[in-house]
Regions:
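Catalytic nucleophile loop
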Residues: 1-12
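C-terminal and late-domain segments of enzyme folds
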Residues: 17-234
Length: 234
């Protein structure tokens, strides 16, 4: 399954919507406007199971769009994708089928987001899920709904218990930049603004860390939580 213009649409707020174009070109599908988030409900080739794939994710600040779509599919159909995969133009993910799951290896100049199925929404606008940023330089395995690295990647060492101010999650490459700065500084997490909401990314005792060949930062087992901005839980 992939994020694309299709026949089923879920309206969401403007910061997560597609760019201008289809209305001006008079090419919007019937009943769809530019502020609708749309997806192709029949899915793709289903080569690796029920996963949702989107492109230019960090470059065009689409991480929250991808996660929002995952939660909306669950809300509308009762069953969502097992994972959401976020690629960029200069990154790739090689997926190899194995008897005990999928082997995953990122390559390129950045890396790949892998979001697990989100929990139920914690309020009108919020959600919690587990995510991983797969940078080049390590091989991971997806099995039974969880990611495991297959090398000797060390556990993430927290050197600063504070939450790093990550800026705006809806700026291009904003979330990825905040995550990498968090890892370089050894912070316990990072918090970002997101259209009046607050996005918190926290490490866990299960988080493993590695650095890619071009300085990319790879981290597993992160908890991402979107909540009202007034909620300052740490």
């Amino acid at each position: 399954t992939r994020a694309a213009t299709g026949t089923a649409a879920t309206p969401i707020s403007a910061p997560f919507s597609m760019p201008e174009g289809c209305e001006r070109a008079n090419r919007c599908p019937p009943g769809v406007v530019e502020d609708d988030l749309t997806w192709w409900h029949r899915g793709g080739l289903d080569l690796i199971g029920p996963v949702l794939v989107d492109t230019h994710v960090s470059e065009r600040r689409r991480e929250l769009r991808l996660i929002t779509l995952m939660t909306d599919i669950v809300a509308s159909t009762g069953k969502g994708p097992e994972a959401g995969i976020g690629l960029d133009e200069t990154s790739a993910l090689t997926v190899r089928k194995q008897a005990d799951g999928l082997q995953l290896e990122a390559s390129g100049q950045s890396g790949v987001w892998w979001f697990e199925a989100p929990d139920e929404r914690n309020d009108v606008s919020g959600w919690t899920l587990r995510g991983h940023y797969l940078a080049p330089g390590a091989i991971a395995r997806w099995w039974n709904g969880r990611i495991q690295t297959q090398g000797n990647e060390p556990a993430y060492m927290v050197r600063n218990s504070r939450m790093l101010d990550g800026g705006d999650a809806l700026q291009a490459e904003g979330l990825r930049t905040a995550l990498w700065n968090m890892a370089r500084g050894g912070y316990a997490g990072t918090a970002l603004d997101a259209a009046g909401l607050r996005l918190a990314v926290r490490t866990t005792p299960e988080t493993h860390y590695w650095q890619g060949p071009q300085g990319q930062q790879g981290l597993t087992d992160l908890i991402l939580e979107l909540s009202p901005k007034s909620d300052r839980r740490h």
